[in-house]
Amino acid sequence: MHSSRRTHLILLGAMLAGALPLRVLAQDAYPNRAIRVIVPQPPGGGFDFVARVLADKLGQVFKPGVVVENRTGSGTLVGTDLAAKAPADGYTLLMGSVSNLVLNAGLYKNLSYDPVKDFEPIGLAVSYSYTLVARKDLPFGNLAELVAYAKANPNKVSYASAGNGSGQHILAAALWHLAGVLLTHVPYRGAQPAYTDLIGGRVDVFFDLSPTARTHVDAGSLKALAVSGASRSPMHPSVPTLRETGVAPLELESWFGYFAPARTPAAELNRLRTELRKVITSPDVMDRLEKAGGKPLALVGDEAKAVLRRDLDRWVPLIKAAGIQPE
């Protein structure tokens, strides 16, 4: 009996010892299948553009490939929730932004995911400022003049957005709240129809991402009043920041980056962060991001988490104080 039991233990020990190299080998082989990046917006927008720029380059390192999967619905809620509930194995990532990880936290009382608890930042790749543009015949030379008129004439000035709860809506509503003025909100189904009416003179002002706004400003069809970043935009060097106008101590930049579901193993997180930093800082990727009007960031791990927490602390209370609603 003792001999049999001893033989059994020896065999079991040999089996376990033999399994260890296989486990190490499996870890070293990560990734051994394609990684998918969930984009919670349709193709063609900022989410999709940045996700594909990074995926194209990262896929050259991770030979099974990096595949972008657009999962839309309820703004950015459906795709983001899907990523939060995905297996935490390093094979599903989220294209995260201020929109789905910060602004949604202030907009929705019962958000189905927690931006901090449900995700681990891989890295932030780029940020874009917003530009406040006005119809070219609006009789104000700067933002301070517009605000002074709006104070004396409540709801006489109108502002467009790309929809209720969009980044354009929240930034504008927060600005008017801090400035103590009332403007009439005109929500559209996307930015393009907002531009059509703005250029046509049927609405007065509109906040949009600076790269898109620049096209219309450079064409002379609209004029720029302010940018939302911490510093002036290289695309509009003569246009002041919101802080510089003296109207409100407000700033917002829309950053984009990759996030993994919480509890993703440390080994996979470290590999992803190491390779993503190399991708973001590669000359060709930086060139593509800068030509699209972005400011490359290359903030990984705790650096990215600090930005997320900072913006949550800034914007969630402000959205609630301003009474901004998603509908």
Placement of each model-derived feature along the sequence:
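N-terminal export leaders
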Residues: 5-12
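N-terminal (or domain-start) structured segment
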Residues: 26-117, 155-156, 164, 181-204, ...
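An extracytoplasmic/periplasmic, membrane-proximal ligand-sensing/linker region
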Residues: 32-34, 177, 244, 266-327
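Short coil/turn segments
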Residues: 42-44, 98-99, 127, 135-140, ...
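Hinge/capping helix and adjacent helix->loop/strand transition within the periplasmic-binding protein
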Residues: 85-91, 106-193, 242, 255-288
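Short beta-strand->loop
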Residues: 114-124, 160, 182-186, 204-205, ...
